[in-house]
Amino acid sequence: KRPVVASKISTMIRPYKPSDLKDCLRIFKEVGWMDGEDADKNIFEAYTRDANCLVAELDGAAEVFVVARTGSMRYLDSEIPFSGVCGVVTSHVARQRGLASKATARSIKEAALNGAAVSMLGMFDQGYYEKFGYGSTTYHRISTFDPASLQVPKLSRSPKRLTSKDAEAMHNCRCRRRRYHGGC
């Protein structure tokens, strides 16, 4: 009896190209991050603009998408370069193959080679942090307070509903804020 040999599946991790857009929109829709609407393209392009993006191909189609952004982090009185992995999205057919982990590791490696002294992961499952050697905060209470003891001044006006027209002003406000130790 001849042994059964699984077919070889071709995989490759490479930089995102505009021609990957259709595959990436499919992945985002598949996992529920997008609705498959016409506006998805614009949202995706805004999300990836000026970011470092990788895809992992499975049999010639992009099935994993990793997006990372660079910036600086305040450490004591210094600014140090960092890179943050903002998202890892994996299609259903590419799951449990290690492709997302390999693409994430490559993104982190490329950031380090390009000068990032600190690497951060966005919110992932706790096991994902541990797999890559990231520390996390403790799970025990360090301090407590009684919320009833807070004395917050009453608003003198109604809150203003912000829209996409306010995006530039909101962004400028965030850029002007004072950064403390650990701030990004």
Regions found by a protein language model. Give the residues of each.
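Conserved acetyl-CoA-binding loop-helix of GNAT-fold acetyltransferases
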Residues: 85-90, 95-113
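Flexible glycine-/small-residue-enriched beta->alpha junction loops
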Residues: 136-153
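Short coil/turn motifs at secondary-structure junctions
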Residues: 71-73, 93, 126
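Short, hydrophobic beta-strand segments that form beta-sheet elements in well-ordered domains
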Residues: 33-34, 119-121
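Conserved active-site alpha-helix within GNAT-family acetyltransferase domains
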Residues: 112-117, 123-141
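Acidic, Ala/Val/Gly-enriched low-complexity intrinsically disordered segments
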Residues: 4-6
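Short amphipathic alpha-helix that is part of the acyltransferase structural core
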Residues: 8-70, 77-84, 150-184
